[in-house]
């Protein structure tokens, strides 16, 4: 009976333990960097939710590579949230500003097993150099 109570408690409390992290889509951050996400590398746990919030017009979120082949593209100027249930690295960008390096990574559950997939993902302009730098920062 004690075992069953423990199992039930874990399942009941699990959603309470999940976090909601906010990432802002910025034209400019406090250091003067233009077209950036407020958190370029977010480290979260399975079950956590990330909410992207546009602070200016013209931004969105488009998933480019992920461990579960997640296809997602938000509408411009809209707040959007995704709950991450699959461990691994997720790579996303702001579609209108991808060439300016407006990208981000999410590491779910500390799992870096798809780092090669992310390293080889499509990138160009400033994005290519920035993606390489962000991936290197994970090791």
Describe the role of every protein-language-model region.
Residues 1-9:
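Sec-dependent signal peptide recognition
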Residues 13-14:
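N-terminal signal peptide c-region/cleavage motif recognized by signal peptidases
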Residues 17-139:
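Extracytoplasmic copper-binding redox domains, predominantly the cupredoxin/blue-copper superfamily
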């Amino acid at each position: 009976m004690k075992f069953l109570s423990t199992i039930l408690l874990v399942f009941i409390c699990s959603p309470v333990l999940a976090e909601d992290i906010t990432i802002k889509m910025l034209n400019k951050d406090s250091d003067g960097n233009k077209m950036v996400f407020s958190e370029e590398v977010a480290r979260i746990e399975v079950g956590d939710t990330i909410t992207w919030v546009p602070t200016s017009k013209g931004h969105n979120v488009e998933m480019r590579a992920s461990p579960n082949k997640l296809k997602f593209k938000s509408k411009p100027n809209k707040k959007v949230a995704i709950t991450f249930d699959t461990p691994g690295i997720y790579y996303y960008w702001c579609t209108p500003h991808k060439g300016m390096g407006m990208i981000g990574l999410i590491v779910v559950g500390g799992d870096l097993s798809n780092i090669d997939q992310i390293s080889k993902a499509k990138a160009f302009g400033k994005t290519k150099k920035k993606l390489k730098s962000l991936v290197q920062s994970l090791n």
